[in-house]
Amino acid sequence: MEELICREGTVHSVIFQNAENGYTVLRLLTEEGEVVTVVGCIPCVAPGEHLTVTGTWEVHPQHGEQLKAQELERTLPEEEEDIFAYLSSGVCKGVGPTTARRIVDRFGLETLDILEAEPERLQEIRGITAKKAMEIGELFRQHMGLRRLMEFLSRYQLPPVLAIRLRQQYGDGAIRVVEKNPYLLSDDVCGVDFSVTDTMALSMGFAEDCTERLEAALTFELTYNENNGHVFLPKDKLLAATCQLLSCGVEQVEAALDALAEHHAVVIQRIANVEAVYLRRLWEAETSACARLLALLEMDADESRFADRTVAEIEKEQGITYAPLQRQAVELAAKVGVILLTGGPGTGKTTTVRGIVALFQKMGLNIVLAAPTGRAAKRMSELTGMEAQTVHRLLGMTWNEAAHQVTFQKTEKEPLEAEAVIVDEMSMVDVSLFSALLRALRPGTRLVLVGDADQLPSVGAGNVFSDLIRSKKIETVFLREVFRQAEQSAIIRNAHRVNLGESPDLKGNQGDFFFLCRRDAQRAVATVLELCKTRLPDNMHIPAEQIQVLTPTRKGPCGTINLNRLLQEALNPRTPGKREILWGERVFRVGDRIMQTRNDYDVVWQKDDGTVGTGMFNGDVGRIAEIDAGGEWLALDFDGRKAPYSVEMLSEIDLAYAQTVHKAQGSEYRCVVLAAMPSAPSLMVRGVLYTALTRARELLVIVGDDAAIRSMAANDRQQKRYSGLKWRLCHAGDASE
């Protein structure tokens, strides 16, 4: 066992501090005059503080001997010069060395107490107004509150960055709130894993059978499964999973579930032969979506008189002749209120959508086009010649901080002006977003839902597009014919082969489709790097920024985590003068390709034409345009939407040189490099391979194991998603809560 070393002294300087995890490197000046380098989790520390550090010596290959902190005690500075160093270090924005010196000279050892409790006394200093005094006091009070909260969290090995979210949600009383019920940390605000909050709560004296623990575990299981695509869980599965999580009896858990239902936190309802348990918001979304869709289906929308003559006019104007199924889809748009249009690549979906748009225009309808992601909306605009926007922006999605939930400007109270709405990439739309869209439609609005039913389902809960098709309650057109021009593309031919359960043709060079066999993961990684850095830019004249690496998985040598690190080094290496920020284990650098990894409804963005909007959403891709000299702010550019991000917001983004196939859904790239190596069984399925192939527009290069690729094509196993939408549509009027 290593000998524990204790050093006591004053923080001389902070060399490095990671805002996300609190990891700090500092210089400690001991009472004996020794300067010691201390490393460890010491959040919110600043020069002038007094530390007592207990730990072990370790030798860093570059920085030499360091004291790795295992335990520490910290107190605020008590000497005037230490108080000056602390105050002038930046702990209180707006107070620099000059102002700090004047404050300390006036108040001496009482400085910190006065700043926090009596900031109005700062007016005693010449040049500090009443307004400035209160501003300084408020900033210092916020700093001290955040510092105490970070220290509290660090005692339970919780990341300091969590303090920011807690303070935003609960204000000055955050510590009291968490002490009263630490299980709140596992809610949607904080997202701490239940096992962590459970350990924390039990150490604080909460009983194993307490109500807070049982209800939190049930909610955690429902939320965890929502994140895996389920709208509800069968009651027996929920009880079994929760009992296993808590190691307790089913009677206690069932009683807690009944209490949650009584308080309307969950809804229990029989769906077919299953007793389904819903989080209330998901139950409301699903039932509302069903009711509103049925109302649209019941309306009299038959405008057949437009169909035959108008479709012929459109063919003549656009210089085309529709295939029978394309004509059927366009004509149906005039006859019924809701239609579904599905088909794979090269089957003419875009041509058909253009025809439907032209039909609606001739009918004099006000048309709105939308898609789930910014990239999909941009592609829809390019293909139709009309403006398309994200569903989120169309509905005016915002975050209501007081209610802690998503809200929409457009609802039944203030519906969309549109008389016809066309939504593309419907396989990406989850039940909550679909419900919100339907709420915003006026009675009589025509709705056209377009997508590829064979692609992966939405990231969010539900299997909406598939449920709608399988219900057979809505007029559906399946485009199956691959047109001659599209057949010339090996990408499209191979995508359809995969969709039929056949292996793609893995001959080396097929024009726009290449396969490079690499059965060793490290060789595959090296090939991916070489393709992106030199071979494709030099030989195919495709710039690196137009190449997207896709992979089924996040983990492993060919996962996004490892590939992003290596691709960043290859494509955007560290150079003198190029600014970067270390955030956890990741480095973010000017010029990096990045992705938004969770919805942020408050981000304000602006385009060059002056258009201003709010909201960045999970899956949005952009780049880092700028990092400020102080490393506190970044300027991000998401396809022309430019937004400032504070360093605390870096937890919302990740590198995007490599993306998972699921994240890439709805996007299309000039060139795709697919790293296809064996991975988790749930990812080695046909839907993942098919979706990956259909992301490439001009060139697809598969690097990987031929056996793994054939296995994926043959494996049609689809992960079951618990959803009641299809059943509700088929049994309208039968469901009862």
PLM ranges: what are they?
Residues 453-615, 625, 732:
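Conserved helicase motor core of P-loop NTPases
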Residues 500, 618-737:
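C-terminal accessory regions
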Residues 270-345, 351, 357:
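Pre-Walker A segment
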Residues 14, 53, 596, 624-627, ...:
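A generic structural signal for residues embedded in beta-strands
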